[in-house]
Structure formats: structure tokens, C-alpha cells
Amino acid sequence: MSKNNSKDLTVGSPTGLILGFSLPLLLGMLFQQVYSLMDTIIVGRFLSVSALAAVGSTGSICFLIIGFCQGVCAGFSLPIAQRFGAKDEKGLKKYVGNAGIVSVIIAIIMTALTVLLCGQILTWMNTPGDIYDLAYQYLIVIFAGIPATILYNLLSGYLRSLGNSVIPVIFLIIAAVLNIGLDLLFILVFNMGVFGAAFATVLSQGISGVLCIIYIAKKVPLLHVSRDDLELDSSYVRNLMVMGLPMGFQYSITAIGSVILQTAVNGLGSIAVASMTAASRISMFMMCPFDALGSTMATYSGQNVGAAKFERVKKGLISASVIGSIYSVLIFVALLFIANYLIYLFVSPSETDVVAQAHQFLLINAFFYIPLVLVNTVRFTIQGMGFSGFAMFAGVAEMIARSLIGLVFVPIFGFSAACFASPLAWILADAFLVPAFIHCLHKLQKAKSSQVTSL
């Protein structure tokens, strides 16, 4: 197969390969953050405060549902990466076909359930009556577009499993630019309101999925499947579910902890909410390299486990952790000098209380970025090795930490306690993940390479 369409991560310098694979992912993630910011500005500036509040009120439930779908698709790509590393073309194609069929089933079920329960979900979330209708208009479209979300995430996962991180990012950037243009078209020209904003998101996501289909059809014969590959095989489906469902639940479990923490901060008043919102927006940009390294390690470890190069997995994890740790130190030092200026992008310098609390949140979290590096690199490495269940339990540890801070310590110590929620979550997750990685590596080293996918 052409080197332009795939990348073998089982040979060569781990550090160089990890950097080369993660940089395109980082570019895409940064672009996605810029798009998200622009989308918020468009809704807030060209519609109304109520529209902005309506869209914002659906954020946690979207993270819960859409995150589950994204996690499942990411998990489905892992056995494909393993088969690619093992040079098992027949097994790879069988996983591609079975993952496609299972994804269609999941898309139908998730879409039907969420669309039918959309109104009830908003009621359960205590959505204010004055924005309920707007929130429903937005959320029902997002839920109806779940198939488009699954299409892009599944196919981009296929490509990344073959070591191609560039093409999915190009299509993601195209979708983001298109989304902004469609936002302006649907909101300013067609006066479609929040419905238009949601439709723009779904349509651009669907187009990026179609672009993946076209690219795979023309350029990636390794992902072309036969009718036999589309016939469900219980052993393949079981492995897909064992890897996919824990990753999906991991996203959802993390979302639950974040919702509980946000609810606690909401009780502290508007200044605390504004402070955390501004600091969180900045943190999302700062954390993109960690996410890129994590996604890289899932593919890297998957391919190398498939090739039975277990010691190479360990070397890659060390390289990724060192890269992330160096970045962590540099960004913490930088924030000591520029944190306030970044906060001024969101609030006026005259809002001294907001600036002070946001500054506190940023620096406390940044001080603990090295534990976050390990959360991302170790967790995704374990997932790529085929042990997604362990990674899910780490997500439970994070949820417990954030929930504990939100329910117990925020009411007592206020905003300062909220600043330590994520650091505590990262440390607890690491306390589980590091021993889990050692256990998984030891188990694989004792197993024959032919048994890897059945673990």
C-alpha cells in the first residue's frame, strides 16, 4: 500500500514517529477550538442572549451523548490498528466491515432514543422555561444528526488506525470552515436561528464524513471490504464491543463528573461561573497537545501490539510522556506571565474578581499538567493495547474526584476548591493507570502475538 495512505508505526524512532503523527492531530484540535469559539460568538452576537444560553445549556448533554458515540468509534479503530501492525489484511478488512455494520445499528438506536427523549432530557436537566423551546430546537437537530457524527468519527478512525493522521485533520478543517460559513448563511440570510446553527453543525459533519468515503474509495484499497467482510462474526463483534463500549462510557462518565462540578460552581454565583468559563476556554487550548499525544498513543500502541513489539510500546509511552512533560513545564512558566492577558480576551480588565479567580484556576491546573500528561498517554496506550476496560475505570476515578470536590468541598471552601477538582481527578486516575499499564504489558509479554486480539 502507498505510504501516502498509511504509516507503519512499528519501525523507526518512537519519538520521531509520535511527534510526526501528533502534530497534524494537534493542528486539527486547535482549529476545532477556534471554530467552537467562533460558533459561540456568532450565536451570541447575531441572535440573542437567550439563544446563547439555550445552546450553552445543552453543552453537557451533548458532551455526554456525542462523546459516547465518538468514544465507541475510537474504540472500533483499535483492533484495526492491531491487525495493520500484524500485517493481517484479511482480519483488518473483517474488522472494518463488522465495525461498519455495528456502527449503523448503534447510530439507529442512539438517534431514535435521543430524539424521542429529547424533551424529557431537557426537563430532567431543569432547563429554564424561557429558553426551553430554543434549547429543544437546537438539541433535536444535533440528536437527529448522530449518524453524521458517527460516520466521520468511524471513517477518520479507520484512517488513523493505518497511521494516516493528516487526511482526517484536513477534512476536519474543511468541515470547521464550512460550519462557520453555514452558520452565517443560515442565521443571517435565512433567519433560521438556533435551528440553523445546529443544522450547520450536522451538515458540515456529514460532508466531512462523505469526504472520508470518497478518499477511502479512491485512495485506500486496504479499507475496501467485500460482502463476506460485512457478515457479522461473533468473535469480531465481541472484540469491537470490548474495545468500543468502554471508551464510549469513559467519555460519558467523565461528562457526569464535569456536570456535577459545574452545578456546584453555578451555586457560587455569576462571578464564579464567568471565571471558570473563561479559564476553561483557555485551558482547552492549553490541553490540546495532551489530547493529540493521547490519540497518537492509541494508534501507536495498537499497531505495535499487533506486531508483538511490546517493548516498543513501553519506549513509545516514555517518549510521549517526556514530550508532554516538557510542554507542561514550558506552558506553566509562560502562564505565569501571560495568564491575565489571555483572560482579558474574554472579560474586561475592570472585572477584577473574575480575572483573579480565572487566574487562580489556570495556574493551579497548569501546575498539575504533568499528571494530566500521564492520564492521556497511559490511558490511550492501554486502550490501544486492547484493555479498554482498565481505561474506563480510570474515568470512574476521575468522576469520583470531581463529584467529591463538587458535592463536598466547593460548598465549604468555595471557588478555590473547584480549582483542585481536575488535578485531584488526574492524580487518582494515574494511581490506577500506571499499575494497570504495567499489568497489561506484563500480560501481553507472556502471551503469543496470535492471541493478542482475543485478550
Question: Model-predicted segments: where are they?
Answer:
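Short alpha-helical transmembrane segments in multi-pass integral membrane proteins
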Residues: M1-S22, I80-G145, V189-L245, S301-F368, ...
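Interfacial/gating helices of multi-pass transporter permease domains
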Residues: G20, V43-F63, G129-L134, V194-F195, ...
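N-terminal transmembrane alpha-helices
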Residues: L9-F46, S60-G75, P79, V104-T111, ...
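Hydrophobic transmembrane alpha-helices of multi-pass small-molecule transporters
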Residues: L64-G67, N179-D183, G209-I213, F285-C288, ...
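Helix-terminus/linker motif at the lipid-water interface of multi-pass membrane proteins
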Residues: L30, V34-A53, L122-G129, L185-M192, ...
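Small-residue-rich hydrophobic transmembrane alpha-helices
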Residues: L52-A112, T149-P168, S275-A339, L372-G386, ...
